[in-house]
Amino acid sequence: MKKAIALILALLLCFSLFISCGKKEEEAETQESDTETEASDECALELRKEIATSSYTVTGIGKSTDAELVIPDSYNDLPITKIDDKAFWGCSQITSVKIGKNVESIGANAFAECSALKRAELPDAVMKIGERAFFSCPSLESVTLGSKIRKIEASAFEKCKALKSVALPESLAALGNSAFFECESLESVTVGDKAIEMGISVFDKTAMLKAKDKWENGVLYLGKTLLKVDTEKTDELVIKDGTTLIAPFAAVDTKISALTIPSSVEKIGNSAFANSDGITAVTIPDSVKTIDASAFASCSALKTATLPDSVRSFGSHVFIHCTALTSANIPKALNEVPQHTFNGCSSLKSIELHPGIRTIGAYAFSRCAFTQVTLPDSVTTLETHAFHSNYSLISINIPKNVSKIGTYCFDHCYKLVDVKNASGISITVGGTENGHVGRFLKELNVPEGKLVKEGDFLFYTFEGVNYLMSYLGESASVTLPDSYKGEAYEMYRDTFSSSRTLTQITVPNGIKKIPTNAFKECKGLTEITLPNTVTTIDANAFNACTALVKVNFNGTKAEFDAIKINSTNSLFINAEIITN
């Protein structure tokens, strides 16, 4: 046992040797010059020797009582290359720090909450400033950054409320989330000739964003980066030529009426135009290589989006909840439709998937308005909820290479009656396995001639019964056909569910039942005309039809009162009922 303990102690000494520059054994060493002696006297800091790199890391304040802290270039002829995480966290004595020329990185929280720190001078060797490195240094007025710095991580200078200006070197490639967040006095930021990758809220709550004299027609640029758009800007946003980066959240919640992106732009950041509900169309130039997550999320008026094949990086949620979107495409360089890309795009009735798409991500097309989907043979994976709640979906193919259908992939696709299965996956009528793909089937591989488009209506025939499945037109006022091929038909469940165009409808004589969810969430429906042949109105047939005010019934009040109306149809019951 004693030998084991001794071995562990020996290993600890070899790989993590902590020393204090002022220790007696070090003072006993022969010094050959006054410079070395002075350096030794100054270096009361706590250090750790890095055996692998033959260098030292500063790990703490040690015995130092200096207000003007100087971190030496080296110790014991080995360079000091790093300041460790939390090394000087909360050291209230420090008023300034000058960091030695060999230090390459400053760790997380290294100088966080140093309340008296006014000046920080970093050498050219520093390439990275860690998360919260100077977080909440309220007295910090001046920071000198070296010429080789590559990255300033999240919240590095957050809440440095006295900092008025900062020069970001040409070498800087990335600023993390909230890097200068709540630097209330920061009014001047200079940058080099290239755009800097930016996280979220980098300069939020700074004086720079409030100084409107630096804005150009409601737009603030930082070098080649579009940093911010005034939320009150209502005219067209024409991004100036030469801009290469649109920063995260740059135009979030704006009222801009149109958008023009120049061919110099290479990247559109996270949520850049999210919730900008005045944009109706967007054309992305072929200079753009990256579109980050949620870039156009919840742009409720956006109808068309044209994406170039130059896009190679495409985030999740890009068009989520763009409820007016009717046309979009997938760039050919992508082999995946990322998760939630078109989730909630309730006007999107079709999309072309290029050969090369392998994966349909989770919720990628959930709550769209597809009637038919054709998947290319390249598709191998349908992730969870990929087509969930496509109430209009009637027909889809499962290509030969598909090996996975995720859970609930087709759940709530109540009208999915036609599945052409070329894969090795087993699909059963009424089955809930493999993403519920077979749950609402009446038969496998519907034969030709049983699913027929007649005019603007789609019909399906099964066991001698004709069903009206869906309306494929765009008219706001619709009259259903009297018959199908001269024969009677029934309305299938969810016939018009979630229609965004329907305002008036006339149901012909002979229809006996208004089925479940027939007009569910038809929020524009104001008036309906029903025949006296209707005897049943099923559950949620008029659920969320909030605009419905008038029901014309071609029969007597007694006939209307005899209809079996499910109690979930209160909006129908409370409308004005007009009888003969």
Give the location of each predicted region.
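Sec-dependent signal peptide recognition
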Residues: 2-10
